Swiss-Prot record:
Record's GO cellular component terms: cytoplasm
Catalysis performed (reactions): tRNA(Phe) + L-phenylalanine + ATP = L-phenylalanyl-tRNA(Phe) + AMP + diphosphate + H(+)
GO BP: phenylalanyl-tRNA aminoacylation
Organism listed in the record: Xylella fastidiosa (strain 9a5c)
Presence of the UniProt keyword Ligase in the record: yes
UniProt-recorded name of the protein: Phenylalanine--tRNA ligase alpha subunit
Amino acid sequence: MVINDIESLTDQALADVAAAQNLDHLEVLRVALLGKNGSITLQLKQLGKLPVEQRKAIGEKVNCVRDLISVALMDRKAALESAALSKRLIDERVDVTLPGRRGERGGLHPVTRTLERITEIFARLGYELVEGPEIEDDWHNFEALNFPLHHPARAMHDTFYFGDGRLLRTHTSGVQVRYMSDHRPPLRMIAAGKVYRSDSDQTHSPMFHQIEGLLIDKHATFVHLKGTLSEFLRAFFERDFEVRFRPSYFPFVEPGAEVDIAWQQSDSSVRWLEVLGCGMVHPNVLKNVGIDSECYTGFAFGLGVERFAMLRYGVDDLRAFFENDVRFLRQFS
């Protein structure tokens, strides 16, 4: 008999399929039973050796067994895959009661922090924040502010000029000129924003941020200026230190002064640091904006925001504020 006990082979094959514990084992069984040299395949190959009268009946039986085993293999494969999926879902289940992952939080740039801190302090002192154009004309940037024609600030190596005579503002003082032209005293305002100068090194940038303040009123004096700036500096740095006013020259103020603070360094030594410039508004400036200098006086001051940010946060190189190094910026988030 070429066909060996097909019933026994079928029973054993179905039992082995049902006992398969994983997909790899099941694949081994499939190859052993239905593969090119599998036991069922070999039975089909031997049909040609049977007498003609037996081939049809036995062939139908072997084909039926093959189909039965194929169905059993598919059913067992589906069951094993379902069991594997269920196990994976259990292993990877999400506990919805656990807190979610916190998203990364950004932070304000240190220059922005410093700008907001300065403007908030002056707002408490009654100063209005005013903005103006970054592209200026010669009148608002120089002439109205009493800059003589020979002043070095007008030179090409200090100022960025456009071909039509306009320029990138070198300070925010032009905002003060516009404000004084449109408003009548008493005035109390600050102007904040980007300014541009042709200079770049460790402590200078071709673009930086500046805040300038202005007060115009009857009987405003240098004493009021000193009191305002001393109060601001102590509020900004949150410490009580000595403040020194040194005579200096600025075309738009008379008298003018540089302001120094007694800064305590990391080794506990103290040295004077220049932090801003100021002075009483020059009568010519008041005249240029239509304010009677016989009735009104005023004072003005200006400071570099990056300079204050460097002091507050201990930054040695101004360029760090503009390099977008995430490692640096994360310190302020």
